[in-house]
Structures are given as structure tokens and as C-alpha cells.
């Protein structure tokens, strides 16, 4: 990426802002080295990493970087055999702790289902050296002090030191308390000079004290003397301190050697944690700038939605939509200076570089950026002072380099192209340069205040004009980019609002060429048309939003209505099922009553009773599987007793007995009588004409033969069970107390099916397999109620 472009677009300032979000000097170092990538795959990976870090920050608020410091210098010292200091070893322990915590943190999130595949890969790369961390922590505390229990030898030495110091202080304090010594001392304190305990003695009493003078006050009036009585103890103390130093050095050497054995792993952990700090800093920056992850492509297409310049205050910057590389590859922004053209140009260039560096861009969702092989920029008044070149010359030197190095996959930014020379010549050069760049297929944004370029977008393919909106009322630019509308100076309008007489403005307009006036008129018309279109679009969007809201409301109401309807239907089904069950129970009661009557009155045929009950059972509607069929309209014919009708509720034929209400009949269905609503009756035929009754002999129950055994051998399973049910009903009506069911032995499936049916049958009192003389397990003996 061209260094001049990075500098002109102030990419270094973005990096400076980034470093504020790093957790360590390692992260800051990596951020300051940040550069745009030219690889589409790498850019996608970098964007995903930042997006994953953003997810972690949203879920957890932060990542554990505590203890992360730059230990690389200490590791290099360990490699060459230098003894590391306690502070350096503490930093190494801190880094190992950071690696352990980060690994546990990221792997835990991944195991919980958080989508962070890239961050999880980094976590897997971390190498926790728990033993080395434990060894360091057992010898050195968090403040870099070697602990007493670092070794037994050190513990003994420090015990000796404390004992000696205590004895020396006790002896000196007794000297200070002596009444004879009070007048000879400058102060009753114990102090240390040259690492030895001393007391302050007045100069004139020097001869009264034996011992060694180690120092004197600045005035010379006080001498700091080590009394002879404690010289030996001070010597012993001094030797103990030497021993302590040697033991500490030995401990540090051992820890350093252990560290040196793992420098490769430690350097590796440093790099991984540095990269993670780098990634999370970018995610924090994205959050601070309200940036989003852009889609990226290699097609040279850029679409930034409500893009904001990241170096401008968030509450002041004006967002703009910028699109390039689709319908047009070149944008020419025209208009007066100080109109905000350069900000737009820099925004596109800087956001492109940010995206290629793996940074999210300050724009709205749906934004897309391209990965260019080069970004070239000729911006501002960067004169080459060393070469004593003019503004025009310095720009032209840069432009020549751009024309030489650009490709079809480059982004080229020209600010005030052709400025700094004669306007006509500058405009002509600008047009020629733009034609050359456009011919290569590069993506271009150029700003200019030359009116000659206003028509450029109308007579060139893949080129469009643009301008920055100017508010005549406030006499200031709004910084709103207007694509498709060339800019104009607005000099006449501004002058008029500032009080310039109309006649002077009229004279000035008269000096303008007719062609220029036509262009200005065209521009004004375009601006008005664009404003109207934007207003209509805004109104349309509002109507669409209202329609969508109404649609959602209707959908919700329909859904609620459907739920209510389904609930009512379920309740109706339940009530209907309950009524049918009640009717079935009533039928069972009727049959039971008929059995009792049968003992005294044998006029009823048993098989007719069973068939009548079966018809009633089959008439029960299946509410769970199908909806009740639509009822047919009852014939308007007036019903009368004796008419044959169809009971729609059960789908059975019956005979009207008598009318029991305004719209209710008593109906005979087989042997059953029940009350039915007239709306549930369908007329079939009128009652037959009365015939002369014939005497019919009643058929006795015993004339209807029911065998004492039922043979099921060879029957299909379902048919066999159906026969068992019918047989049991027949046997009950026949008055049998006990019957036999022959099912055979076979596979045992039929036998088990019969046994299961008998257990739940209402008329079975008990059942058992046959005895040896009754057929064994191939026969079941059934006792009836």
C-alpha cells in the first residue's frame, strides 16, 4: 500500500486511537505496525476475528488479559545464561497465568456454543506451563520478593538474621537508656550506616566510646558510632546477609534455568496473547466508533451506507452513502472549496484501508468494501520543500507516480485535480488524467472546483458527477453528498444574501457565457429534482412502513382468531364426545336391563340385541381423526309417528314413535329408544299402512344356539379378537357361566392377545389356562359375570 496514501489519509491517527484500547504494550506494538492487506481471504479472516471478539465483549464485557507483559527481553537473557531478577520471573509467572486464564476463558465460551472458531484456534495454541508457574510462585511473591520458604537454607538464614538484629537492637537500646549516656548522645535513636547498626554521639564525647565511626552529620557535631560491644554481632549480621544474597542468587539461577528450558513455548505464548490483545483492541475500537463488519469482495465494488469519518467527533460528523464500482467506476465531485469534498474523498479512502486492515468500518449494516491491490492518494498541499517544488509541481510528481503504478484493481483518489495552475490548462489536464485512469479500469474519486468538469459525468461512460450540498440559508455546506448532481459555486446567491446590490449581481451574470448559464440552470434543476425525489422516497418509505405494520397487525389478528376457532372446535368436539359416551353408557345400561328381563321374557332375540349394540358403537364419530360431516337439511315434510327416518348424528335408520317437544322426537333405533332433535333427523319414507296383525310365536332364547367353546385356530389375529368379543356377548346373553376359547399354542401371539382382551373385558370375571384334561395352555377357560 502506497505510504503516501497512508499518510495523506491519516491512517496513523487511526492507529493511535486503536492503541488506547490495547491491554498491554505488546498489543500497542502490534497495532502501531498495522497495515492493510491485499489478500481477500486474509481480510475476511481478520474481519471474522474482530467480529468474534465483539461477540465475546457483548457477552462478557471484557477478556482476561491480567498479567500480560512483554517478557521477551527477559527470555533472551535467560537463553544466554544471565540470572533473571525476581521482578522478571514474576512477570514470566504473570504471563503464564494470563495464558492459562485466556485459554480457559475462550475454550469455555466455545464449549457453551458461542460461535468463535478463530478465537478458539488461538486458545488451543496457548501452552500452559503450570509447573514452571507453580515453581516461580512458590519462591517469589507478587511484589518480586523471594519468600522465606523458597528453600530450607534461606529460611534458616533469615531466622538467623532476625535473631541477630533483635540482639543488636536490644543491646543498643540498653546503651541509650543508660543515664550516663544521655548527655553524650545527640538523639536516642538507633540508625544504620554502611549497612551496620550505629548510634548518634556528640563530637566532644568521641573518646568516651570505643568502636568505629561510620559517618558524621553535615555540621560535624554528631558522629555515628558503632560501639565496640556490638562489632562482633554486626559482623555476624553482615555475614548472614552475604549468605542470604548467595542463597537467593542460587534460587534465582535454578528458576532461570527452568525458564530457559521453555523459552520457545514462552515466546509462542507471548505471540498468541499479543495477537489476541491486538484483535480485542480492534473490537473495542469498533464498539467505540459504532463500526460494523463490512462484506468484502475482490470486484472493486464499494458501498458504504451512512459512512462516517472516524477522526471527526461522532456528534458532529455527517454520515453519507457512497457507492463506487457498480454502475460507475468514477465519481467527480465538483463545487467550491471548503465545501466538504475532501472529507468525502478521505472517508472512502480511509474506510477502505481500515477494512483491508481487518478493522470494522464506521457505517451501517449492509456496507461493503473492496480489497484493492493499491490505494493511491493525491491530497492536500503537501509541497516537497526539500526539492523546492511548487504546489502544482509536487502534485504532478505524485500523479506521474500514480499513473505509472496503478492497475485495474487500484483505488485512486485525486483532491483538487489540476489545481495550482492556469484554470483552463488545469481543467484540461484534469480531464486528460481522468480519461487515462478510467481507461485502466481503476476505481476513481476526484474532487475539483473547475466548472469545465461539471459536464464530464454526462459525456463519459462509467462516470458520474457529484457534489456536496450547500445551504443557502445558513451560507454553509451541509456536507451531504449528492450523487448525480454536479456542484456549483452559489456565489451569486451568497452575495445577494450578504447584501450585494441586485444590479451588481445582474451585471455579473451578464458577463457569464450563455453556455455557463445553461449549465448552472441545469444543475439547479437537477438539485431540485433530486430533493423532490428524496422527499417522495421518504414519503413512500413511511407509507410502506405503515403498510407493513398494518400487515403484521392483521396477521396477528388472523392468528389469534384461528387459535380461538381451534380452541372452540376442540371444546365442541370434547362436549360431543362426552355426549356420545353418555349415550353408550345408557345403551350398556339398557342391555343390562334387557338381560334381566330376558330371564322372564324370552320374546327378544339375543343376536338382535348384540347387533343393535354393535351398530350403536360403530355410530360413534371419530373426533380425533376427522371432522363431523356436514348435516343434510331435513326434509320440510311434516313428520309423523311411524315415519322411517335417518338419525344424522349416528348415521342409523330409525322409526318415529312420538313427538316429545316442539322440535324433538322419541325414535326407535333397533331395540333402543332415544330422544333426538328434529334438526338431526332426515325423512326417508312414510309409515306403512296398517296391516292385519298376525300372531307370531315368540322365539325363546334357548332356540338361539351358542356353543360352549370357541375355536380360533387358523384365524388371523385381528379377526380372532373380533370373534372373541362377539362370542363373549353372545355367551352372556345365553346365560352361560363359563366358556372355553381354543387358541392353540403356536407362537403364543394369539394366546397373549386373547389373554390381554379378557383382562379388560367388562363381562369377564376370571380366566385361566386349561388343565391337562381341558387342553392345557392351548385353551383358556373364561368365567363370566
From Swiss-Prot:
Record keywords: ATP-binding, DNA-binding, Endonuclease, Hydrolase, Nuclease, Nucleotide-binding, RNA-binding, rRNA-binding
Biological process, per Gene Ontology: mismatch repair; negative regulation of DNA recombination; rescue of stalled ribosome
Stored SUPFAM superfamilies: DNA repair protein MutS, domain III, P-loop containing nucleoside triphosphate hydrolases, SMR domain-like
GO molecular function: ATP binding; ATP hydrolysis activity; ATP-dependent DNA damage sensor activity; endonuclease activity; mismatched DNA binding; ribosomal large subunit binding; rRNA binding
Smr domain boundaries: 710-785
EC number: 3.1.-.-, 3.6.4.-
Organism superkingdom: Bacteria
Protein name, UniProt field: Endonuclease MutS2
Organism the protein comes from: Bacillus licheniformis (strain ATCC 14580 / DSM 13 / JCM 2505 / CCUG 7422 / NBRC 12200 / NCIMB 9375 / NCTC 10341 / NRRL NRS-1264 / Gibson 46)
Origin organism lineage: Bacteria, Bacillati, Bacillota, Bacilli, Bacillales
Gene: mutS2
Amino acid at each position: 500500500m502506497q505510504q503516501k496514501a497512508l499518510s495523506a489519509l491519516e491512517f496513523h491517527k487511526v492507529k493511535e486511537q486503536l492503541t488506547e484500547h490495547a491491554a498491554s504494550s505488546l498489543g500497542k506494538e502490534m497495532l502501531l505496525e498495522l497495515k492493510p492487506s491485499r489478500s481477500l481471504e486474509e481480510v475476511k479472516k481478520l474481519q471474522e476475528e474482530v467480529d468474534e471478539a465483539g461477540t465475546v465483549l457483548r457477552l462478557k464485557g471484557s477478556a482476561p488479559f491480567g498479567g500480560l507483559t512483554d517478557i521477551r527481553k527477559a527470555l533472551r537473557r535467560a537463553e544466554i545464561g544471565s540470572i533473571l531478577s525476581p521482578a522478571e520471573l514474576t512477570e514470566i509467572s504473570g504471563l503464564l497465568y494470563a495464558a492459562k486464564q485466556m485459554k480457559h476463558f475462550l475454550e469455555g465460551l466455545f464449549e457453551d456454543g458461542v460461535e468463535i472458531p478463530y478465537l478458539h484456534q488461538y486458545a488451543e495454541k496457548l501452552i500452559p506451563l503450570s509447573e514452571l508457574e507453580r515453581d516461580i510462585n512458590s519462591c517469589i511473591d507478587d511484589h518480586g520478593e523471594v519468600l522465606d520458604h523458597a528453600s530450607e537454607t534461606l529460611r534458616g538464614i533469615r531466622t538467623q538474621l532476625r535473631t541477630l538484629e533483635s540482639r543488636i537492637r536490644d543491646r543498643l537500646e540498653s546503651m541509650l537508656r543508660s543515664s550516663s549516656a544521655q548527655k553524650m548522645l545527640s538523639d536516642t535513636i538507633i540508625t544504620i550506616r554502611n549497612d551496620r547498626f550505629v548510634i548518634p554521639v556528640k563530637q566532644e564525647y568521641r573518646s568516651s566510646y570505643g568502636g568505629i565511626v561510620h559517618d558524621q552529620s553535615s555540621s560535624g557535631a554528631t558522629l555515628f558510632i558503632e560501639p565496640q560491644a556490638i562489632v562482633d554481632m554486626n559482623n555476624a549480621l553482615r555475614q548472614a546477609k552475604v549468605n542470604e544474597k548467595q542463597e537467593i542468587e542460587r534460587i534465582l539461577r535454578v528458576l532461570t534455568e527452568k525458564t530457559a528450558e521453555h523459552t520457545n513455548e514462552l515466546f509462542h505464548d507471548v505471540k498468541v496473547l499479543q495477537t489476541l490483545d491486538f484483535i480485542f483492541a480492534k473490537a473495542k475500537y469498533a464498539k467505540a466508533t459504532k463500526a460494523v463488519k463490512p462484506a468484502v469482495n475482490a470486484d472493486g465494488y464499494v458501498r458504504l451506507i451512512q459512512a462516517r469519518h472516524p477522526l471527526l467527533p461522532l456528534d458532529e460528523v455527517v454520515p453519507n452513502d457512497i457507492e463506487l464500482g457498480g454502475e460507475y467506476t468514477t465519481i467527480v465531485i465538483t463545487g467550491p472549496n471548503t465545501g466538504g469534498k475532501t472529507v468525502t474523498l478521505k472517508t472512502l479512502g480511509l474506510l477502505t484501508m481500515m477494512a483491508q486492515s481487518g478493522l470494522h468500518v464506521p457505517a451501517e449494516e449492509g456496507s461493503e468494501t473492496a480489497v484493492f491491490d493499491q490505494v493511491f492518494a493525491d491530497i492536500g498541499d503537501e509541497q516537497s520543500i526539500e526539492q523546492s517544488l511548487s504546489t502544482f509541481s509536487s502534485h504532478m510528481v505524485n500523479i506521474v507516480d500514480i499513473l505509472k503504478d496503478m492497475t485495474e484493481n487500484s483505488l485512486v483518489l485525486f483532491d483538487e485535480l489540476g489545481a495550482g495552475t492556469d484554470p483552463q490548462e488545469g481543467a484540461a489536464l484534469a480531464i486528460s488524467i481522468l480519461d487515462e485512469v478510467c481507461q485502466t479500469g481503476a476505481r476513481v474519486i476526484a474532487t475539483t472546483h473547475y466548472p469545465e468538469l461539471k459536464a464530464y459525468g454526462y459525456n463519459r461512460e462509467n462516470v458520474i458527477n457529484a457534489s456536496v450540498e450547500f445551504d443557502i440559508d445558513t451560507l454553509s455546506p451541509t456536507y451531504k453528498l449528492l450523487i448525480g448532481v454536479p456542484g456549483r459555486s452559489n456565489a451569486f446567491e451568497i452575495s445577494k444574501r450578504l447584501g450585494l446590490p441586485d444590479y451588481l449581481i445582474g451585471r455579473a451574470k451578464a458577463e457569464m457565457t450563455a453556455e455557463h448559464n445553461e449549465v448552472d440552470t441545469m444543475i439547479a434543476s437537477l438539485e431540485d429534482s433530486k430533493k423532490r425525489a428524496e422527499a417522495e422516497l421518504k414519503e413512500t418509505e413511511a407509507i410502506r412502513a405503515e403498510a407493513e405494520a398494518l400487515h403484521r397487525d392483521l396477521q396477528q389478528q388472523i392468528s389469534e382468531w384461528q387459535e380461538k376457532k381451534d380452541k372452540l372446535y376442540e371444546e365442541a368436539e370434547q362436549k360431543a364426545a362426552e355426549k356420545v359416551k353418555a349415550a353408550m353408557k345408557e345403551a350398556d345400561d339398557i342391555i343390562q336391563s334387557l338381560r334381566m328381563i330376558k330371564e322372564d321374557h324370552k320374546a327378544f332375540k339375543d343376536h338382535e340385541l348384540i347387533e343393535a349394540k354393535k351398530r350403536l358403537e360403530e355410530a360413534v364419530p371419530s373426533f380425533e381423526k376427522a371432522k363431523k360431516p356436514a348435516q343434510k337439511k331435513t326434509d320440510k315434510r311434516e313428520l309423523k309417528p311411524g315415519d322411517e327416518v335417518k338419525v344424522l348424528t349416528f348415521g342409523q335408520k330409525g322409526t318415529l314413535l312420538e313427538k316429545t317437544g316442539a322440535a324433538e322426537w322419541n325414535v326407535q333405533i333397533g331395540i333402543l329408544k332415544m330422544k333426538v332433535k328434529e334438526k338431526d333427523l332426515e325423512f326417508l319414507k312414510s309409515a306403512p299402512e296398517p296391516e292385519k296383525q298376525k300372531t307370531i310365536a315368540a322365539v325363546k332364547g334357548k332356540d338361539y344356539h351358542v356353543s360352549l367353546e370357541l375355536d380360533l385356530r387358523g384365524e388371523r389375529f385381528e379377526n380372532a379378537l373380533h370373534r372373541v368379543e362377539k362370542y363373549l356377548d353372545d355367551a352372556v346373553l345365553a346365560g352361560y357361566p363359563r366358556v372355553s376359547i381354543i387358541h392353540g399354542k403356536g407362537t403364543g401371539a394369539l394366546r397373549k392377545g386373547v389373554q390381554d382382551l379378557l383382562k379388560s373385558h367388562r363381562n369377564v370375571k376370571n380366566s385361566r389356562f386349561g388343565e391337562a384334561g381341558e387342553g392345557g395352555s392351548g385353551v383358556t377357560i373364561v368365567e363370566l359375570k
